[in-house]
Curated annotation (Swiss-Prot):
Other comment: Present with 1760 molecules/cell in log phase SD medium.
Gene that this polypeptide is encoded by: CPP1
Start and end residues of each stretch annotated as Disordered: 1-106
Glycyl lysine isopeptide (Lys-Gly) (interchain with G-Cter in ubiquitin) cross-link, chain position(s): K32
Modified how: Palmitoylated near the C-terminus.
Topology within the bilayer: Lipid-anchor
Family: Belongs to the CYSTM1 family.
Cellular location(s): Cell membrane
One term under GO cellular component: cellular bud membrane
Protein name as annotated: Lipid-anchored plasma membrane protein CPP1
InterPro entries for the chain: CYSTM1-like, CYSTM_dom
Amino acid sequence: MSANDYYGGTAGEKSQYSRPSNPPPSSAHQNKTQERGYPPQQQQQYYQQQQQHPGYYNQQGYNQQGYNQQGYNQQGYNQQGYNQQGYNQQGHQQPVYVQQQPPQRGNEGCLAACLAALCICCTMDMLF
């Protein structure tokens, strides 16, 4: 797929911006969207606590940037953008056990024979 096909035009054409016909959303629309998140009263309490005690975490466990102490923001997603389900949180990691094989004996003879054969081959190659 070419860029012209993707963007729907030729390289020399410029699309004209048209101004939207509707005005921006009113404050009634903003009140509806605030119902989905934290209510404004809790946000006001949060900012009042931050002004009284700057630099400390408030009682709800959120720091100044709006992230809680565990690294997850208010919507339930961590800072990398993954949700909490299916990922281990810090402090709940499963231990990993590593087993080392005991050293095996009896291969030294074979290793010495291969090294001797390699030395003989290199010596013969240099002589002839």
